[in-house]
């Protein structure tokens, strides 16, 4: 089924953000693993895998609409060098993803493309959950102290 060019462009933009998220979360996971922060490693790794599955659903939708998924285009990775930077950069990235998803979902409504809207709505729901989790982690650091937070992240998730 041939789809609207603008719809495919919006889907490719969402794909670009998910591909960036895969890489950023995966690198952050492995950095946390290297530091012995097993629980944080597991969380970041799981989110990286979720982003990969979300990218897969976007790729399938672009192909269904007879477009070509762009897997070569990425945003700049926001790599943290400390745990607070990692959490802050992941939050910044997710807020950008959320803004892009909300914009694209509104566009799909105007085009009456409810399937593409639903694909992005599922991603939006998970993105908002990640934003909430990241904000909670920042709250924990500010209220319990970085040392206590890091100690809590050394165990298994």
From Swiss-Prot:
Coiled-coil region: none
Cofactor entry: heme
SUPFAM superfamilies listed in its UniProt record: Ferritin-like
Molecular function GO terms recorded: ferric iron binding; ferroxidase activity; heme binding; iron ion binding
Outcome of gene disruption: No visible growth phenotype in iron-sufficient conditions (30 uM Fe(NO(3)3)), in low iron conditions (no more than 36 nM) cells grow at half the rate of wild-type. A double bfrA-bfrB deletion grows as well as the single gene deletions. Even in iron-sufficient media both single and double gene deletions have lower photosystem I content (PSI, which contains 12 Fe atoms), store about 50% wild-type levels of iron, and undergo iron-stress.
One GO BP annotation of this record: iron ion transport
Cell compartments where the protein resides: Cytoplasm
Superkingdom of origin: Bacteria
Limits of the Ferritin-like diiron domain: 1-145
CDD domains: Bacterioferritin
UniProt keyword terms in alphabetical order: Cytoplasm, Heme, Iron, Iron storage, Metal-binding
Binding residue positions for heme b: 52
Subcellular location, principal: cytoplasm
Membrane-spanning residues: none
GO-annotated cellular components: cytosol
Role: Part of the iron-storage bacterioferritin (BFR) complex which stores about 50% of intracellular iron. Missing most of the residues required for di-iron cluster formation, it probably does not have ferroxidase activity.
Family statement drawn from the similarity comment of this UniProt entry: Belongs to the bacterioferritin family.
NCBIfam families per record: bfr
Oligomeric and partner information: The bacterioferritin (BFR) complex is formed of 24 subunits (BfrA and BfrB) of unknown stoichiometry. The BFR is arranged as 12 dimers that are packed together to form an approximately spherical molecule with a central cavity, in which large amounts of iron can be deposited.
The name this protein goes by in its record: Bacterioferritin BfrB
């Amino acid at each position: 089924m041939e789809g609207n060019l603008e719809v495919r462009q919006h889907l490719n933009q969402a794909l670009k953000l998910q591909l960036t998220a895969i890489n950023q979360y995966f690198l952050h996971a492995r950095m946390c693993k290297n530091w012995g922060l097993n629980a944080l490693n597991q969380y970041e790794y799981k989110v990286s895998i979720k982003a990969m599955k979300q990218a897969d659903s976007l790729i399938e939708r672009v192909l269904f609409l007879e477009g070509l998924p762009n897997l070569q285009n990425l945003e700049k990775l926001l790599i943290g060098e400390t745990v607070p930077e990692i959490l802050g950069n992941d939050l910044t990235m997710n807020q950008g993803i959320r803004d892009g998803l909300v914009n694209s979902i509104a566009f799909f409504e105007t085009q009456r493309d409810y399937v593409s809207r639903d694909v992005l709505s599922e991603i939006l729901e998970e993105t908002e959950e990640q934003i909430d989790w990241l904000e909670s982690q920042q709250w924990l650091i500010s209220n319990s102290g970085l040392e206590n937070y890091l100690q809590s992240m050394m165990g298994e998730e």
